[in-house]
Each structure stands twice: as structure tokens, then as C-alpha cells.
């Protein structure tokens, strides 16, 4: 009887459109992920650029906010402030473009029980991974997306795409464009791109936003652009404690019931972290990194952080980049240090690392290009570009030009602590 049912199921699935079965599994999986998403907060770093009508794009400012996801809502506070309020991020900026809804809004629309339209577009390569792409549409009457500008506020429909891992069913990127924009909003185009990655919170992996990009074009010709990075995510209402195993074993972190998050370290301290976790090209983004502080960290000749204090973080970025013969882009995010019973949030700039073959903080690109002139002949141009990676508190990013990646246990990174507010 079971064999007959299996044959009937196989015959039924053979008649499905391409990608339909995978879509069903992706949506079901994402509903489960959203249902178990805990109360958690992250540091949100927003880099804003603005181009006036007829002008050129220039940096506007950098904003940092604490964002708390709770009960399918996002609420905000100033960095280091635990007094979250039910407000919009624009309340902290006064003007300019800034968006929200990264944790659940876009994912909920895709994974929800509503009857949206989907179209399978095949597999595409994204950051070195083969992902299934789907186009989708959220009609205005089913949309929870709103745009707020100084001229007003309005709900918009969405047409977009998402990319899902066929093996894990995780949605790893969403690209959404507003449509059916109300006439009261002076907007020509509004585009959002969100990347998701696994983040380990108190020993459990959750799918959280890692970065987002926004682009808003107004009728006037003004163009606003945002890049957002989410770092230092942790459970809200729980704090980790640390226990040590046998000699030589890396420290272990566990959850305890403490409302307040850890304290912030003073700026301008030099901290050397020796990693206990081996990192290779097979390590997944979001994987937990454990390490220890090497050498005492002093303040006014007193030991603030003793040698051997445990450090915790995650692999924030690990992807293959084809530029200049190929290299790995590696981002290591350290979030907390435990010292003498006090847990410190780790905000610091990467200063140095151990030397490894092919490891560098930047990559130089030399280009030799020949252009054909309209009236005959040609012109040769040489250019020199430097690739560099974003500067985020507590995140060390670098390139490794090698076909295989191996950051061994004992690999050391040197940091200088910084103030949270720039």
C-alpha cells in the first residue's frame, strides 16, 4: 500500500511546473523559521549617500541604531540605550532615506498563506552559491509595505525576486521594487535588496538580515541610496555566561536570564584575539567562532581584561570573488568578551592579522583597456582600482588569494576598540 502511495505521489509531482515543489518547501520552511524567530536586537549601521537633481552622488552621513525585533515588529533605540520605543527609524534621523522591515516583513509576504503570483526563473550563482530564483508579486491590497517621505506616507505594491538555497530551503536574498505608488508620493523608483545569513544566538542558529540596500529616485531627480549592515545581534532578555572545559578546550558559552546586555569597552584599547576555531572554505556563514584574548589588556596599569579571557563571534562573510584571479572574501565578527564575570560588547577596528600566504586587506586592480575612436584609430587607457571592504565595528574583513582557505586555530587578529557612536 505504501509503495502504491509513493508511486501516486511521484506521478503527481511529475505534473508540477518547474520549481513548484521546491517553492512549496521553501515557503513552508520559511514559515517555520519566522515562527521561531526570537526577541533579538542588533546594531544597525546605515551609510547614506545623496545625489541632488543634476548633481553627483556624495556621502551624506553614517547612522547607528539599536534595532529590536519583537513580536513581528521592529523598534529602535540609540546605540547603547536599552529604552526601545515603538517608533520609526526616521525619528532618529530627522531627514533622508532610511528603511525597515528587514527581519520579517518581506519574508512574511513571500512565505505567507496568501495567494501571490510566483514564477520560477532557474538557478543563478550568488556569492559563489547556486541558488534558485523566483520572481513574485504582492498586489497593493495584500501589501504591508509603506513608504514614508517628508511629503507623506503611502502603501505600495511589490514586484520582486528572491533567491533560495535548494538544499536548505533558506531564502538568502530578496530584491523588491515598489509599484502602484500613490500619486501623493513624489517617487519614481524605490528598490530594496536584503541579504540574509544564519546567526548563532545562545547556541541556536536563526536566519537574520545581514545587510540591505535601498535606492529611492524622486520626480525632482534627487537620488538617495542607503547601505545597511546588521552586526552584534543577540537575544534580548538573555545574556550569555561562559564555562571552561578541560585544559586546552575552547571556552563554552551558555544562556542565563539577565535582562541587560553587556557593558561597552573603553575606546583606544589594543586587544589581540587568538582564534580557537579553524575556518576553511567549507565553513558556513553564521558559524560560531570562539577565541581567547592573548596578553593582558591594561587600563591605567591595571588589568581590565586578563590574558585568556574568552571571546565569541561568528563568520559574517565567506565568499569567492573572481576579481584578479580569484580570492576569498572573509569577514570575522567578534561580538563579546567575558572578563572577570563581566561581559563586554566588542566594538573595535581590525588593526593587524597574522601573516598568511595571499592574505591582504585590499586588492589592487590594474586595467589596460583599448577604445576604438569613432573616426578611426584607437586610444589606450590604463587604470588602477583598489578593492576594499566595509568598515564595521567588531568586524574584520580581508581577502585571501588562494584556491583553498585555511585560517588555523591560533590565528591572531589585533584590534583597537572604538566608541560605538561615530
Describe these PLM feature segments.
Residues 1-6:
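Bacterial N-terminal signal peptides
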Residues 7-10, 87, 380-381, 400:
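Intrinsically disordered, low-complexity, compositionally biased regions/tails
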Residues 11-158, 166-172, 177-264, 421-422:
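Structured extracytoplasmic
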Residues 123, 163-164, 336-337:
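Hydrophobic beta-strand positions
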Residues 151-161, 329, 402:
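Glycine-rich, flexible loop segments associated with nucleotide phosphate handling
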Residues 159-165, 298-299:
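Active-site and channel-lining beta-strand-loop segments
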Residues 172, 197, 260-422:
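Contiguous beta-sheet cores, especially beta-hairpins with glycine/small-residue-rich turns
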Amino acid at each position: 500500500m505504501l509503495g502504491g502511495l509513493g508511486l501516486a505521489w511521484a506521478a503527481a509531482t511529475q505534473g508540477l511546473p518547474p520549481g513548484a515543489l521546491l517553492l512549496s518547501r521553501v515557503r513552508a520552511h520559511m514559515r517555520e523559521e519566522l515562527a521561531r524567530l526570537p526577541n533579538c536586537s542588533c546594531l544597525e549601521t546605515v551609510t547614506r549617500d545623496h545625489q541632488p537633481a543634476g548633481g553627483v552622488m556624495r556621502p551624506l552621513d553614517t547612522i547607528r541604531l539599536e534595532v529590536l525585533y519583537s513580536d513581528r515588529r521592529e523598534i529602535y533605540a540609540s546605540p547603547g540605550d536599552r529604552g526601545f520605543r515603538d517608533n520609526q527609524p526616521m525619528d532618529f534621523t530627522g531627514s533622508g532615506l532610511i528603511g525597515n522591515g528587514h527581519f520579517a516583513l518581506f519574508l512574511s509576504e513571500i512565505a505567507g498563506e496568501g495567494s501571490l503570483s510566483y514564477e520560477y526563473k532557474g538557478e543563478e550563482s550568488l556569492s559563489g552559491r547556486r541558488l534558485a530564483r523566483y520572481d513574485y508579486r504582492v498586489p497593493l491590497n495584500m501589501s504591508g509595505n509603506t513608504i514614508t517621505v517628508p511629503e507623506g506616507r503611502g502603501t505600495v505594491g511589490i514586484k520582486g525576486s528572491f533567491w533560495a538555497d535548494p538544499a536548505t530551503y533558506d531564502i538568502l536574498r530578496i530584491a523588491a521594487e515598489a509599484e502602484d505608488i500613490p500619486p501623493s508620493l513624489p517617487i519614481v523608483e524605490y528598490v530594496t535588496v536584503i541579504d540574509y545569513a544564519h546567526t548563532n544566538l545562545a547556541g541556536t542558529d536563526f536566519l537574520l538580515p545581514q545587510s540591505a540596500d535601498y535606492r529611492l529616485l524622486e520626480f525632482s531627480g534627487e537620488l538617495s541610496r542607503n547601505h545597511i549592515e546588521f552586526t552584534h545581534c543577540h537575544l534580548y532578555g538573555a545574556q550569555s555566561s561562559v564555562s571552561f572545559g578541560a585544559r586546552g578546550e575552547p571556552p563554552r558559552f551558555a544562556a542565563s536570564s539577565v535582562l541587560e546586555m553587556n557593558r561597552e569597552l573603553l575606546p583606544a584599547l589594543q586587544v589581540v584575539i587568538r582564534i580557537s576555531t579553524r575556518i576553511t572554505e567549507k565553513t558556513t556563514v553564521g558559524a560560531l567562532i570562539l577565541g581567547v584574548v592573548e596578553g593582558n589588556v591594561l587600563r591605567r596599569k591595571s588589568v581590565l581584561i586578563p590574558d585568556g579571557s574568552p571571546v565569541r563571534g561568528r563568520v559574517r562573510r565567506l565568499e569567492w570573488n573572481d576579481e584578479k584571479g580569484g580570492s576569498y572574501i572573509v569577514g570575522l565578527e567578534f561580538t563579546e568578551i567575558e572578563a572577570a564575570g563581566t561581559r563586554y560588547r566588542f566594538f573595535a577596528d581590525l588593526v593587524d592579522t597574522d601573516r598568511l600566504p595571499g592574505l591582504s586587506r585590499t586588492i589592487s586592480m590594474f586595467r589596460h583597456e583599448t577604445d576604438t575612436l569613432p573616426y578611426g584609430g584607437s586610444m589606450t587607457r590604463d587604470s588602477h582600482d583598489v578593492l576594499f571592504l566595509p568598515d564595521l565595528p567588531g568586524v574584520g574583513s580581508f581577502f585571501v588569494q588562494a584556491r583553498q582557505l585555511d585560517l588555523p586555530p591560533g590565528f591572531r587578529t589585533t584590534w583597537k576598540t572604538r566608541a560605538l557612536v561615530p
